[in-house]
Amino acid sequence: MVQLNGSYKLEKSDNFDAFLKELGVNFVTRNLAKSASPTVEVIVDGDSYTIKTSSTLKNSEIKFKLGEEFEEDRADGKKVQTSVTKEGDNKLVQVQKGDKPVTIVREFSEEGLTVTATVNGVTSVRFYKRQ
């Protein structure tokens, strides 16, 4: 069984700018986001999950229980209702509702974390190495 708890450092991004553009993030913020190299920390405590993302651009944190809806500030600055479910032992699927629904799939492995985010058919894949 793959351990979800841990710290992960961004190594590579594919199509991240196009994803942010489709989401409605402005040019300046997109360029800052592309140059940032975030660290993601995942903490699982019983049935409670915390995902902290830290970078020179911005820090964010979401806390949730699987299947329970919560409010979150999306990358475009909008507040949206979000829920997260678990598929198998190593995959978290996050759905952000709103004018532009977003699906974020976090797949964990011994080596790291792959984050696949999709909005309006535009998909970005980001690869993080386990620290």
UniProtKB/Swiss-Prot annotation:
BP GO terms, sorted: long-chain fatty acid transport
Subcellular localization, as worded in the UniProt entry: Cytoplasm
Record flagged with keyword Signal: no
Keywords noted in UniProt: Allergen, Cytoplasm, Lipid transport, Lipid-binding, Transport
Keyword Cytoplasm applies: yes
Residue numbers binding (5Z,8Z,11Z,14Z)-eicosatetraenoate: 106, 126-128
Binding, (9Z)-octadecenoate: 106, 126-128
Cellular compartments per GO CC: cytoplasm
CDD domains, per the entry: FABP_Der_p_13-like
GO molecular function list: fatty acid binding; long-chain fatty acid transmembrane transporter activity
Free-text note on domains in this protein's UniProt record: Forms a beta-barrel structure that accommodates hydrophobic ligands in its interior.
Family statement: Belongs to the calycin superfamily. Fatty-acid binding protein (FABP) family.
Stated role: FABPs are thought to play a role in the intracellular transport of long-chain fatty acids and their acyl-CoA esters.
Name of the molecule in the record: Fatty acid-binding protein
